[in-house]
């Protein structure tokens, strides 16, 4: 049965209540701006949810996994088999993201978008496979345009299921050996940058491997230059199955007015594509952290994003997005619970 191509009807947030919301924030018992980035974060959430009581319900971490053909060229410190091994580790609860999700109260779901060999007989892995690893992007397209559409449809259904269960915050993580190469290529294509400005060391490759990685991405961009006529075509030529489904899920979550928490370099590349498809997605994105990956800061600046954390993370998995949840909850709580100057009988500091 053929899947229909999803279209996303995303409304921009209303700024009609901005003055009321900002005044409510400013009249809390503190000097204006004293809570730093938590204040614009509270404003953003109030724009999305309305200016009365804010809330986070059933926060959910989605970790999308997929393998990359370019990984066979040795662009990572680890072979592609590690993607499958880490997916098993997620399912058994032993990875960093499992630990953080248990600590912080996230529901965790792991999605196999297309690792080389599926994990059999293990509960807790959602099968949304688009293939057994992408094409090697320096030699051929990563996938077909029809595959991108199928991935978007799967992601839309996934988000709808969580939305129906009452979830209003979804965080995005990933796992895929070679996916920093795909993300850097996407960044270079969409932002029209030199590859050297986008490519980093990923999980910690040598200078020699870094040069090879850069060369392969340059070959990929040259090979697909004429075919990359829009953001979906960029995904088809350069993307990963997990990046495609993250992009579709971000679009679907924004359509449903959910809070979208973006992790590191790869998740931000998916966000870049989503915003290029529909600029209104940006209103719903909360950027968790600035990673160690060279190029991430430039992408964040392009998206006018001020990440909440800078911890030197370079793991992926959604770890930074998980660690940002207490700060997002703190923004909600101060907005809802903190006394105003008049409530407390204190002379306003303005």
From Swiss-Prot:
Recorded GO MF terms: nicotinate-nucleotide-dimethylbenzimidazole phosphoribosyltransferase activity
Record flagged with keyword Lyase: no
Record Pfam families: DBI_PRT (PF02277)
N-terminal signal peptide: none
EC number of this enzyme: 2.4.2.21
Key words, A-Z: Cobalamin biosynthesis, Glycosyltransferase, Transferase
Cross-referenced InterPro entries: Nict_dMeBzImd_PRibTrfase (IPR003200), Nict_dMeBzImd_PRibTrfase_bact (IPR017846), Nict_dMeBzImd_PRibTrfase_N (IPR023195), Nict_dMeBzImd_PRibTrfase_sf (IPR036087)
Enzyme class: transferase
Gene Ontology biological process: cobalamin biosynthetic process
UniProt-listed SUPFAM superfamilies: Nicotinate mononucleotide:5,6-dimethylbenzimidazole phosphoribosyltransferase (CobT)
Top-level division of the source organism's lineage: Bacteria
Biological or metabolic pathway of the protein: Nucleoside biosynthesis; alpha-ribazole biosynthesis; alpha-ribazole from 5,6-dimethylbenzimidazole: step 1/2
Active-site residue list: 317 (proton acceptor)
UniProt catalytic activity: 5,6-dimethylbenzimidazole + nicotinate beta-D-ribonucleotide = alpha-ribazole 5'-phosphate + nicotinate + H(+)
Family annotation (NCBIfam families): cobT_DBIPRT, PRK00105.1
PANTHER family, alphabetized: NICOTINATE-NUCLEOTIDE--DIMETHYLBENZIMIDAZOLE PHOSPHORIBOSYLTRANSFERASE
Function field: Catalyzes the synthesis of alpha-ribazole-5'-phosphate from nicotinate mononucleotide (NAMN) and 5,6-dimethylbenzimidazole (DMB).
Family assignment from sequence similarity: Belongs to the CobT family.
Protein name in the entry: Nicotinate-nucleotide--dimethylbenzimidazole phosphoribosyltransferase
Annotated source species: Shewanella sp. (strain MR-7)
UniProt gene name: cobT
């Amino acid at each position: 049965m053929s899947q229909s191509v999803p279209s996303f009807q995303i409304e921009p947030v209303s700024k009609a209540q901005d003055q009321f919301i900002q005044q409510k924030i400013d009249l809390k018992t503190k000097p204006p701006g004293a809570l730093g980035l938590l204040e614009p974060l509270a404003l953003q959430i109030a724009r999305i949810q309305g200016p009365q009581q804010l809330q986070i319900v059933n926060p959910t971490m989605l970790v999308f996994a997929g393998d990359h053909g370019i990984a066979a060229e040795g662009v990572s410190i680890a072979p592609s088999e590690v993607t499958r091994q880490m997916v098993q580790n997620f399912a058994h609860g032993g990875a960093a993201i499992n630990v953080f999700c248990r600590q912080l109260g996230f529901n965790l779901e792991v999605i196999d978008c297309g690792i080389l060999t599926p994990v059999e007989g293990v509960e807790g892995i959602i099968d949304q496979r688009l293939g057994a690893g992408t094409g090697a992007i320096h030699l051929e397209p990563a996938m077909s345009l029809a595959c991108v559409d199928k991935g978007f449809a799967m992601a839309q259904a996934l988000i709808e299921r969580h939305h129906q269960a009452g979830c209003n915050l979804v965080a995005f993580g990933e796992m895929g050996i070679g996916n920093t190469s795909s993300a850097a290529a996407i960044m270079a294509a969409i932002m029209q940058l030199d590859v050297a400005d986008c490519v980093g060391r990923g999980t910690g490759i040598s200078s020699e491997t870094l040069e090879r990685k850069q060369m392969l991405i340059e070959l990929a961009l040259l090979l697909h230059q004429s075919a990359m006529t829009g953001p979906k075509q960029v995904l088809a030529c350069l993307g990963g199955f997990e990046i495609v489904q993250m992009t579709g899920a971000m679009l679907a979550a924004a359509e449903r007015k959910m809070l979208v928490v973006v992790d590191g370099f790869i998740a931000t590349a998916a966000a870049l594509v989503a915003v290029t498809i529909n600029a209104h997605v940006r209103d719903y994105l909360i950027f968790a952290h600035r990673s160690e990956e060279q190029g991430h800061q430039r992408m964040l600046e392009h998206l006018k994003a001020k990440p909440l954390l800078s911890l030197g993370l370079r793991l992926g998995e959604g770890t930074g997005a998980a660690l940002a949840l207490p700060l997002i909850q703190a923004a909600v709580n101060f907005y809802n619970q903190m006394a105003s100057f008049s409530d407390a009988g204190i002379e306003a500091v303005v």
